[in-house]
Amino acid sequence: MLGLKGCLTILIGYVIAVCALFSSRGRNPSLTDWEKLKDQKISNIDNFGLTGQHLLEFFQENLPFLSFSEEKYRHKHVSLYYDVFKEYILRRANSKKCLPVDSAIAKLNKDVNPMPVHSHNDYWRKLPLFEGLAYGASSTEADVWNIDEKILAVGHNEAYLDPVELTLDKLYTGPLLEILDEVNCQDSDSDRKNGVFFNSPETSLFFYIDFKSDDNELTYKLLMEQYFKSLIDSGYLTYYDMKKDEIIWRPVTVILTGNYPTSLDILDNGNDNGYFESNQRFAFLDAPLLSLEPKYSKLSVAATVSFSQLMKHCGSDHWKVSLRGRMDSNEISCAKSIIDGAHALKLKTRIWGAPTWPANLVETISRQIIHDLGSDLLNLDNLFMASSLI
């Protein structure tokens, strides 16, 4: 029979166990795990079992522990967050083992459906390319500047470019090639290519290249002969087949916007049979939505207009819409007819420059653009908001 001292010992132990149980329920389990494993190197971990938004949140919450004992992260390339995330995502991309189900795409967006959203100013995000793919955004963009006639740096303002780390190949074309090689390893010679969305491998990623430099001809030459060449050689870029007079869809569709060249002589390198004399054109023009012509059905896959231009064309003003809080029936009818005209040419549509504040106005106008006007790509900076509106 237990004495008083023994009973008290058991009771105290029981109380401590119960308190520990309830206190652990109030803690972040992922953070608790990483507090215990903070000496574990991220390079020893292949898959956390998280995808999409949950993966992004996990990295943001646990970044100090994920990089705690990694000497290589002492000197950043883009940022600590980007460097650690990219290393984790692409770790197995260059391995000899062919296993698409455990690929970078599987880590990024398994169980995430592609959404008709354009990742506006994607290069400004903490994780260029990767964040948009994690949310399932089916369109992205990069502003490019020609540096020393040989480097395409990515950035919004010429004064803040980094021609060493923030370049088109390091942020976009390089990772895209690794990702696509990984999910097409089983039959690399097949005409059927898997894309960058796990749940929808047939969906093509629209990749807008915004020309910023004056010498657009040289920029285009660098794109074709340097930055996109490996993607072209691997069969990953959508192209216009000059012989068949049709568009052949592939995992990535390049759309030129901004100060891009429009001359076919430049686009096809002075040849009648395409830039590489293969009867293929691998870049499409961002067509002007308000002045479409039949020729754009072959030159383009998408047409764009700013919200202010669209409202002005419809006899209104974007400030009136903002003050009212929504587009009225006349504005909707006019804008929808323009979008229907683009659809008749088999072009997708994108409207940029819609109100960005306050949040309720953004949500209302965004829903009207997608649901009432029938526009194809919602142009938003906030991907979390976009995912809740589609």
UniProtKB/Swiss-Prot annotation:
Protein name: Altered inheritance of mitochondria protein 6
Positions in coiled-coil regions: none
Organism: Saccharomyces cerevisiae (strain JAY291) (Baker's yeast)
Family: Belongs to the AIM6 family.
Keywords from the UniProt entry: Signal
GO molecular function: phosphoric diester hydrolase activity
CDD domains per record: PI-PLCc_GDPD_SF_unchar3
Domain of life: Eukaryota
Disulfide bonds: none
Signal peptide: 1-26
Gene Ontology terms: biological process: lipid metabolic process
